[in-house]
Amino acid sequence: GVYKFSMAISPLDCMGCGVCTHVCPVGALTMQPLESQEDQQPVFDYMVAKVAEKKELQDFTVKGSQFRQPMLEFSGSCAGCAETSYARLVTQLFGDRMYISNATGCSSIWGGPGATSPYCTDKNGHGPAWCNSLFEDNAEHGFGMYVGQEKIREDLMSKTEQLIAIEWTQPALKEAAQKWLNTKDDGNANAEATKEYVAALQANIATVDELAAVPKFAEHAAELKAKGEKFCDCDACKLVAEILDKKDYLSKKSVWIFGGDGWAYDIGYGGLDHILASGRNVKVLVMDTE
């Protein structure tokens, strides 16, 4: 094959629960004293620093998901905790465009301990956006996150349509804008379309200095510069600037509500029932440990 496969384990981060040795169907792992495994730490560090994801191996199958970067790591949860296994898998599938509203409970303790976060980012700085409100209003809190970003995105769609309609908008920008609109409801396709759209927006906004280089616009450029403006104020450039200001909301988000059975089945049930009945595209992960 093209690639070789290896699993590197971080000895310094092992919780010592032994679950991996029990569930491995071929008995490939055994528990060993920490001091006998310390020479394996540089191997793990090398893998993290040097080995990149292989996009051609990734898909939404069980096997394919495991070739994707986990965006939940070293949480400090209890040894053998199953909650982090499920949460980690969700981040492998949707983490680079994920919003999480987390009910107070175990998952908010390992998920948001003071001064640190187990949720991480990829090489592009993209990763789960996590927030914890209270115990009883988690569903409403997550719903608010969804509706808020949806409203901003609807505004960006309107501005994009206006930008396409302007006669002097560059053809390449119009093409990227239309591709973004066409894929707006497809999370995977829209991720790539968003990258292309942002690049086209950044390449097609005229700065005041560029405007000043055109003789017929030189006087107007000087007026803009005196006001402290950085960009051309034509209708197209104003729309481009407004869209770029909210570029983090362009990609389709995957909004999740995390919580335990005490929240979902008891104190927060009324809110959860209301949110699910709304029909909005909000996902819920209930960690039932009762």
Briefly describe each language-model feature range.
Residues 1-2, 6-10, 15, 19-37, ...:
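Iron-sulfur cluster-binding cysteine motifs and their immediate structural context
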Residues 64, 72-104, 108-114:
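N-terminal amphipathic, basic-rich helices that act as targeting or association modules
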Residues 112-150, 286-290:
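Mobile "lid/hinge" segments at catalytic clefts and subdomain interfaces of large enzymes
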Residues 84-89, 99, 109-121, 196, ...:
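Thiamine diphosphate
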Residues 1-7, 34-65, 69, 97, ...:
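Ferredoxin-type iron-sulfur electron-transfer modules in oxidoreductases and energy-metabolism complexes
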